[in-house]
Every structure is written in C-alpha cells, then in structure tokens.
Regions:
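Short beta-strand segments enriched in small/hydrophobic residues
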Residues: 14, 19-24, 58-74, 174, ...
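Bacterial carbohydrate/catabolite-sensing allosteric modules
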Residues: 1-2, 46, 87-92, 140-147, ...
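N-terminal helix-turn-helix DNA-binding module of bacterial transcription factors
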Residues: 1-64, 333
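Alpha-helical recognition/docking segments in bacterial nutrient-uptake
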Residues: 1-7, 61-173, 177, 232-239
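Conserved functional loop/turn residues at catalytic and ligand-binding sites
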Residues: 10, 16, 21, 30, ...
C-alpha cells in the first residue's frame, strides 16, 4: 500500500492546531506561544514533515529562491563565483536556480524572464553588458539584482567586483617596467564595458604614466576564442611586441601555446600577464603570472548583498570593490 504524503493538514490535525499556526511555526513567525510551537515541532519531527517550498512562498509571498545567471557553467571563473554564492545562500536558507546563458542575449532574456515567472526573490547576474530588452526587463520588475564579478552598462545595478581599471594599469605598468615599449592588450570584445571602458582605460593609464604613446595597433581585439589568438601569436611577436596583458586566462593560454609552438620562448622572448588567476594559469607551462581576484569572496559578498536587498535593509552598499593582487609566476621575468 502506497504511503500517504504528510501535508500541513496532517500536522495540524495531529497537533490539534490550525493550519495557519503550523504555517507560522514553519516560517519562523514569532507570534506563536512557546508551548504550541514546541508541540508543532514535535509532530513535524515525528511525521518527518517536509514543508513544500512553493506553498511556503505563497503564504509568505517569498519563495526563498534565488536565480543565478551564469554565462558558461564550465568556465572556472564563473564556477568559483558560483561556489561563493551557493555557500552564503545555504547559510541564509535560500535555494539556488542556476541558469546557463551561453553569452547569448536572446537566451539571457529568456532565462531572466523564466526566473521572474518562477517568482525568485532575487537574481545574481554574472555576465557582461545588458541588452536594451534585458535592461527594461530588470527595471520593470521589483526583483532585486546584483552583478557579480563584472562591470555592465547599467551603473544603477548593485555590483561586487575588483577595480578592473586599476588592476589593468598595474599589470601593464609591470610589463613596461621590464623595459618593454611595445606592450599589447589582448582582449575579447571591446564592446563589453569591462574591456572597452575599464581595462582599456587602465592600459592607457599605464602607458601615459610611463610616457609611452598609445598605439591602437597594439590593441588586439579577438572573438574570445582560444584558436583565434593561438593563430595570431606568431604574427604578434614578429611585429615587435615583446609583452602582452591579456584580459582572460583562456586567451592567455591560447597566446602562450601559440608562441611556444612557434619556438618563441616565454618569458625570455615574450612576457604575459593574465587577468583572472583561475586554474588555467597553473595548469599550463610555464605557469602564468596573473591578476588575482578573490572570486569566491566576490560570489559570497554578492549573495550577502542580495540578501540585504531582498530584506530591504539600510546597511548595504550598492557598489562593493574588493582587493586584488598580482601573482608572479613563470610567464614574466623578475618574479
């Protein structure tokens, strides 16, 4: 005989209280007498009752669910951010809906609309710039949004990040200090604010401070693929460039392998500094010098900020900038 599911009605009947009282106990409402609360909890334990999250949401107008929009679930950069998000979500009793967007604007919009339809309490957005449709979708909803580990083209959205402009400036300055007059910037799309505004500006800041004239021919914009920069590596070195600051680790490994496979030694003939310090930087040889971002902390702080927004507390910052560093490895000299 099939075992009947234990419902809130079952608990109320066994405890001889109303379903409203059981609901208040389950949702942590303080307006229940201690003796009554304990009686309900004892029945819940004895019957092994598992409250239905959707039903609880209908009662409290909250679903205790957060949507996380991630561009590429296999990318270690976003995976580390997600780990920090998940740990804090668990601490505050929130469930996570993880949605992969594949860097596709149409899919991102569909994903966000789906999360809104599921009535999530908040959204953490990992990715780059917002399309006009997505911006309108965010603004038309009362659901709070936090941007994690990036810069987008909507400064009104709360964000947790490092100072990407300052970090880029420090990386390029280090390469310039190694007597390189021709330092390239290798980047994915400059259409993304994080690259076209912050990192490009940091690159130009370092050049200006060192008295080196900016040459737009040294800004190598790619489609973000490993293959494209791998194929361009030899031509870049042959053009007289002796060092490059690269905006993500995937591209940096492509550049490194392209140089190495063409007999160009790193760091003897060419130096590289990358940006994210994911596992990619330590799995290649030589290992890559990189800007180090506290990715786990960025994810964790993003989730904590979102909890404050969802609870509408006053003690919150809308733009949180965490510290970064540069980790020296084998792709640069003078470690």
């Amino acid at each position: 005989m099939e075992k009947q599911a234990v419902t809130i009605y079952t608990v109320a009947r066994e405890a001889r209280v109303s379903m409203a009282t059981v609901s208040r106990v389950v949702n942590g409402n303080p307006n229940v007498k201690p003796a009554t609360r304990q009686k309900v909890l004892d029945v819940i334990k004895r019957l092994n009752y598992r409250p239905n999250a959707v039903a609880r949401g209908l009662a409290s107008k909250r679903t205790t669910t957060v949507g996380v929009v991630i561009p590429n679930i296999t990318n270690p950069y976003f995976a580390e951010l997600a780990l920090g998000i998940d740990d804090i979500a668990s601490m505050y009793k929130y469930n996570i809906i993880l949605a992969n967007s594949d860097y596709d604007n149409d899919k991102i919009l569909k994903v966000v609309r789906n999360l809104h339809a599921k009535q999530v309490d908040g959204i953490i957005f990992m990715g780059f710039d917002l399309s006009e449709e997505l911006r309108a979708e965010f603004k038309s909803s009362s659901t709070p949004v936090v941007v994690a580990g990036s810069v987008v083209n909507d400064k009104e959205l709360p964000a947790v990040r490092i100072d990407y402009r300052k970090a880029a400036k420090e990386a390029v300055a280090r390469l310039l200090d190694h007597n390189h007059d021709h330092v390239a910037l290798v980047t994915s799309s400059l259409g993304y604010s994080i690259n076209g505004d912050d990192r490009l500006s940091g690159y130009q800041d370092a050049l200006a401070e060192a008295g080196v004239q900016f040459d737009d021919q040294l800004v190598i914009e790619t489609d973000g693929s490993y293959k494209q920069i791998y194929d361009q590596a030899k031509a870049l070195a042959d053009s007289g460039v002796k060092a490059a600051y690269v905006t993500n680790d995937h591209l940096a490994v492509g550049l490194l392998n392209g140089l190495t496979d063409n007999g160009i030694k790193v760091p003897t003939d060419f130096e590289i500094i990358s940006s994210n310090d994911t596992t990619y930087t330590r799995l290649c040889r030589p290992m890559l010098t990189s800007i180090s971002q506290p990715l786990y902390d960025i994810g964790a702080v993003s989730m904590r900020l979102l909890t404050k927004l969802m609870e509408d507390t006053d003690d919150r910052e809308n733009d949180v900038i965490l510290d970064h560093s540069i980790v020296s490895r084998q792709s640069t000299r003078l470690q």
